């Protein structure tokens, strides 16, 4: 996969041959986002008291990220920031849960499993006792589609600009990477790719859609996500002084190289970002 796969002309895709209809596009987007919102509310309601189901936490965070991407697309920075904060509130809970199940699959020593299980239990109790889930439910109840809706002409302009903005943001991010991309650089790139993918996903049923590019972003997000997970596991293992930390560190290095290789295959592009259309 190269930058061209993520920035090639929209006309190369069959969906682009249809005459754009802004009203229909807006209706399709709102239908999709309404489903995201309904699911986010359902998952938030399901998380009442510990122990929390891991998949429910994961899906809630995913749909909050999708709603954040929609708020960014409609240029509602305050709403987007609140949604991003909600995701952050649940980040450590999600990480510890994924780490615990990762250790179980690796048949880690019982002592290591107990330490992580205890940390997970404490984090779940903290999330429950600080009212974070209540705050998320309240925020979602107030964040109706009607309150953040934009005029049809505004949405049409945003859809028309989506390709150019995506190309510019991706190209700029790649040019900022050091020759051997660092942990922080890869983490920032992953968050950007995730946001770009969700924006593409939201527009999937419109005449501006590009399924090919959306799937390319999804593959890149998965590669970077696998690496970022191993990075978090490595740091947790060191902090908790787990017996299996050396094995985790070795695996981390392997995933770090995979992520770097994926980025090297992308570019960086030689052309100015404004030319990547």
Predicted features, each with a name:
Residues 1-277:
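Function-determining surface determinants
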């Amino acid at each position: 996969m190269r930058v061209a796969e993520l920035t090639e002309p929209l006309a190369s895709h069959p969906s682009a041959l249809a005459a754009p209809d802004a009203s229909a596009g807006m209706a399709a987007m709102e239908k999709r986002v309404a489903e995201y919102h309904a699911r986010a509310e359902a998952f938030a309601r399901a998380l009442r008291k510990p122990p929390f189901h891991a998949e429910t936490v994961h899906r809630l965070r995913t749909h909050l990220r999708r709603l954040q991407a929609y708020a960014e697309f409609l240029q509602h920075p305050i709403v987007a920031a609140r949604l991003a904060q909600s995701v952050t509130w649940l980040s450590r809970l999600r990480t510890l849960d994924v780490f615990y199940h990762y250790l179980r699959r690796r048949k880690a020593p019982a002592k290591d499993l107990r330490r992580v299980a205890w940390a997970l239990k404490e984090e779940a109790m903290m999330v429950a006792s600080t009212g974070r889930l209540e705050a998320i439910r309240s925020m979602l109840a107030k964040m109706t589609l009607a309150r953040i809706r934009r005029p049809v002409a505004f949405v049409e302009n945003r859809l028309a600009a989506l390709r150019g903005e995506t190309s510019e943001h991706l190209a700029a991010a790649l040019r900022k990477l050091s020759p051997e991309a660092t942990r922080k650089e890869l983490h920032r790139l992953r968050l950007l790719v995730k946001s770009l993918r969700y924006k593409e996903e939201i527009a999937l049923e419109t005449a501006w859609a590009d399924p090919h590019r959306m799937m390319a972003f999804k593959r890149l997000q998965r590669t970077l996500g696998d690496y970022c997970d191993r990075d978090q596991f490595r740091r947790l293992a060191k902090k908790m002084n787990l017996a299996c930390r050396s094995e985790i560190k070795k695996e981390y290095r392997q995933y770090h190289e995979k992520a770097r290789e994926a980025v090297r295959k992308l570019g960086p592009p030689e052309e100015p970002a404004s030319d990547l259309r």
